Amino acid sequence: MLFDAALLLSFGGPDGPEQVRPFLENVTRGCNVPPERLDEVTKHYLHFGGVSPINGINLALVNELQVELDLPVYFGNRNWEPYIEDSVVTMRDDGIRCAAVFITSAWSGYSSCTRYVEAIARARRRAGTGAPNLVKLRPYFDHPLFVEMFVDAITAAAASLPAALRSEARLVFTAHSVPVATDRRCGPALYSRQVGYAARLVAAGAGYADYDLTWQSRSGPPYVPWLAPDVGDQLMTLASAGTKAVIVCPIGFVADHIEVVWDLDHELRSQADAAGVAFARAATPNADRRFARLAASLIDELTHDRVPVRVNGSDPVPGCLASINGVPCDLPHCVA
């Protein structure tokens, strides 16, 4: 399969205070999120001037991709400007015929994969005749470079702790929670199992035999079951058991979303300080050059029909495959 362009497809985020509420309404439309929760998250964004940190990160990643790939690189978002629909129209007008789509989500699942596939389909319909073929690259939660970046981040975070606490620090992984029903929708529990498997790979690479896997940033009605335990609740459990230091690894995020810089760096750190627990947060990949190399590796798999590159050579948690033009791949959890 030959590509004449690449498209970085991300989540999107506001670029100013006046954009925050419309952005959040875009993200949560149809999800039955209480208005009080939107009010709360609005304050989180306004704390940072109403600007999402992922905007600058994505532009930096586009630059890294342009260095790594011998292709023009376009950029579009699912939930905010530049929308993927507008980007694909531009690609059509530029004469692009077939583009590899790299999404800033490492996982399978409805929220982390299927909704991006749906966005690709919408964008091609909007572009109409002459729309380029869009090939979404596979999830990469077990790619060696994905694991390596988080291993290095944990090692650096541990080094930032007081020397006397490093050996006893508890490693805590966290990812964005979703409703249990949503996790089962592309099941059985595909998203949570992939996160768990990636955490196991990263912990082993960083030299940790024991760790905790937690979830964060739930936003739905309180009566709806979401993935648990919550990272804050687990922190309090650890503190009560005498844990003196934690290393929090946001393995579910490939960039510093507001859920990282507010929910973890602000709220969770404050909780840890109040409980007398030393806190270190591992970095996300952001615009690490290795992230661009990872994208190039996925493109190479399709261009040269190579076996997917995985840490252990096989996929014990079968995920989505590459998909074309917004059509789900052939696996049962995608077409069900």
From Swiss-Prot:
UniProt key word Iron: yes
Biological process according to GO: heme biosynthetic process
Family membership noted in the UniProt record: Belongs to the ferrochelatase family.
Protein name stated in the entry: Coproporphyrin III ferrochelatase
Annotated residues for binding of Fe-coproporphyrin III: S52, Y116
Record gene name: cpfC
Keywords attached to this entry: Cytoplasm, Heme biosynthesis, Iron, Lyase, Metal-binding, Porphyrin biosynthesis
Any one GO CC term of the record: cytoplasm
Main subcellular location: cytoplasm
Compartments, record wording: Cytoplasm
EC number: 4.99.1.9
Species, as recorded: Mycobacterium leprae (strain TN)
Pathway field: Porphyrin-containing compound metabolism; protoheme biosynthesis
Entry-linked HAMAP family: Ferrochelatase (MF_00323)
Taxonomic lineage of the native organism: Bacteria, Bacillati, Actinomycetota, Actinomycetes, Mycobacteriales
Coiled coil: none
Residues bound to Fe(2+): H176, E259
Function: Involved in coproporphyrin-dependent heme b biosynthesis. Catalyzes the insertion of ferrous iron into coproporphyrin III to form Fe-coproporphyrin III.
Catalytic activity: Fe-coproporphyrin III + 2 H(+) = coproporphyrin III + Fe(2+)
Pfam family, one: Ferrochelatase
Any GO MF annotation of the entry: ferrochelatase activity
